C-alpha cells in the first residue's frame, strides 16, 4: 500500500506512519485478520500494490499505536505477548496487550459514542479469540477486559445522560465457554479459506437504516442492525410486526473501505442505483 500526503501533514507524521513494525509472525492469519470480512481481506491481498491511503485518514492508527507503545512499558504482567495456535491446519496468531495471571486486557482508542453503545461484537470476539489462544498454549483465561480511551471525551459532559465519568473506561467482556470459542474460531477459518469469496454482510458494511420493522397497519420504522430491530419488536406488548429489508446506506462502502473500487458487490449496487 502506498502512503500519500495530499493535505500537507508535517514530515514527522509521514515517517511515523511509514515506520510500521506490525507483523503477525509466522502465521497464516492474525486474530484481527480473521475478524475482517473475508471479501475485504481477499481483495486487499489481490490488489495490495494498487492500494493507497492518505496520512490524514490514518492519524487514528498513529494515536492507537502511541497509546499501546506507552502503556506496554508499565503493564503489571505479560505485555504484548504474541501467541500462536492451530485450527484446521491453519496457524493463527494474536498479540495480547496485557496478561496478568490469565486476566486479559486490551486497550482501545475510540470515541465516546462507541463506549455509550452496547459492547461491539468484534471486540467481544477478539478478546475471546485471545482466550482461545491462551488455552492453545496450556493456560486459562480468567477474565476479559477492554480499557477504552475516549479520544473525544469532554469533562463538561461527564456523568450526564450516560456520558462516561472519565476518558478511561474499563469494559468487562463476557468470557465464552471453551466449546463456543473453538466453534467460533473454526467458523472464521472456514469463511476465510473458502474457495468462493463470501459477500459482505449488512453488519460488516456498517449499514444504516436497512432493517425495517413494519406493523399490521403498514407503519415502518427502520433500524441499523437486526438485533436492534428484534429488540424493538420484543418490547411491543401488542400487535404483529415483521422485519424486512429496506433501502439504506452502507457507511463502510461509501467512505471507509479501501478496496471498494475493486468490489463487485459494491460496484453492482452503485450501478443499479444510477
Language model segments and positions:
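Active-site-adjacent bridging/hinge elements
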Residues: 104-106, 232-233
